[in-house]
Curated annotation (Swiss-Prot):
Pfam (any one): FBPase
Keyword Transit peptide carried by entry: yes
Organism: Pisum sativum
UniProt KW keywords: Calvin cycle, Carbohydrate metabolism, Chloroplast, Disulfide bond, Hydrolase, Magnesium, Metal-binding, Plastid, Transit peptide
Protein name, entry field: Fructose-1,6-bisphosphatase, chloroplastic
């Protein structure tokens, strides 16, 4: 029961006696009549009045003002505005479908025995998790079936892969299908990262009828060169975080938008628009287990963060070990995320093409900054698909501060 008016009236959305009341009516009971007649186990007729449901519903609509915008409808709006074309809408929709499938796989990983390693090593020399392999297949298949993707490059593939001619489109999509998969067994946040580059007809290989291999060979190196574009050429980028909720964060070069997966309807719903990162923050996110491997300037920077600042408090350390999870927190609350070069990984550990560049595109659209410590990440020209670079990303003031230490 819920109070309807100040005169102590009670509205029942379900009548106690469906056989006696029209299903298209709401019954309003006078509270005093109900209470005084409760001992007789029935309600006096004088305490009941009915009104049509349609009338009450229209009043509710006027009061609520709720409007749900799904990712699909939002993309169509951007298409109507001329910001993106129909082809890109289809590619982004196929990526969102892949993310829904991966989200389901991640949530059921322990139940479906999908935790642990696959028993293989990827091009990075890393042990592949079972879900690394499956997520890569899911992502690749969704992009192929879209009919709008020409070339895809993945963390789990040695080289760029051309989509079969019968399904081939033009867009170039780079992605990390499951970032942070080493945390999967512990049910820690993971995610998928992607970037989309503009089409180039010259890049599409011409397969002969006798070709049964769609992996680019030496004769199609021009396609690999075309995939290796600087992040400044990105048309769209985003990530999907699989955590207590599933968040799909997207930019098409006109701000950053956050969509949350509604498990009831299976749709991504717009929950934040034109997200802006704070200009500064008091959270730093570095893996300090590598502290002894860092150069002295970086050590000095980290040491200074631990001293009381203008607020009288030192910075807080937060580190999940998942780029998507750590970046998402930084995007919301401000601060800095860093994965520097060290004595073991002289070029850094994160991949430029499908990790650093997409994230830097997102953070810049949110008013932040992405740097390798000396230059803007989006200005770096990749020389190979799996090229690694150091990364410092987050609030503009925080990134500029670390750049001064490293200069």
């Amino acid at each position: 029961m819920a109070a309807a008016t100040a005169s102590s009236q009670l509205i029942f959305s379900k009548p106690y006696s469906p056989s006696r009341l029209c299903p298209f009516q709401l019954c309003v009971f006078d509270a005093k009549s109900v209470l005084s007649s409760s001992r007789r186990k029935h309600v006096n007729g004088s305490g009941v009045r009915c009104m049509a449901v349609k009338e009450a519903t229209s009043e509710t609509k006027k009061r609520s003002g709720y409007e749900i915008i799904t990712l699909t409808s939002w993309l169509l709006q951007q298409e109507q505005k001329g910001i993106i074309d129909a082809e890109l809408t289809i590619v982004l929709s196929s990526i969102s479908m892949a993310c829904k499938q991966i989200a389901s796989l991640v949530q059921r990983a322990n139940i479906s025995n999908l935790t642990g390693t696959q028993g293989a090593v990827n091009i990075q020399g890393e042990d592949q998790k079972k879900l690394d392999v499956i997520s890569n297949e899911v992502f690749s298949n969704c992009l192929r079936s879209s009919g709008r993707t020409g070339i895809i490059a993945s963390e789990e593939e040695d080289v760029a892969v051309a989509v079969e001619e019968s399904y081939s489109g033009n867009y170039i999509v780079v992605f990390d299908p499951l970032d942070g998969s080493s945390n999967l067994d512990a049910a820690v946040s993971t995610g998928s990262i992607f970037g989309i580059y503009s089409p180039n007809d010259e890049c599409l290989p011409d397969f002969g009828d006798d070709s049964d291999d769609n992996t680019l060979g030496t004769e199609e190196q021009r396609c690999i060169v075309n995939v290796c574009q600087p992040g400044s050429n990105l048309l769209a980028a985003g990530y999907c975080m699989y955590s207590s909720s599933v968040a799909f964060v997207l930019t098409i070069g006109k701000g950053v938008f956050v969509f949350t997966l509604d498990p009831l309807y299976g749709e991504f719903v717009l929950t934040q628009e034109n997200l802006q990162i704070p200009k500064s923050g008091e959270i730093y996110s570095f893996n300090e287990g590598n502290y002894k491997l860092w150069d002295e300037n970086l050590k000095k920077y980290i040491d200074d963060l631990k001293e009381p600042g203008p607020s009288g408090k030192p910075y807080s350390a937060r580190y999940i070990g998942s780029l998507v999870g750590d970046f998402h927190r930084t995007l919301l609350y401000g601060g800095i995320y860093g994965y520097p070069r060290d004595k073991k990984s002289k070029n850094g550990k994160l991949r430029l093409l499908y990790e650093c560049a997409p994230m830097s595109f997102i953070v810049e659209q949110a008013g932040g900054k992405g740097s390798d410590g000396h230059q803007r990440v989006l200005d770096i020209q990749p020389t190979e698909i799996h090229q690694r670079v150091p990364l410092y990303i987050g609030s503009t003031e925080e990134v500029e501060k670390v750049e001064k230490y490293l200069a």
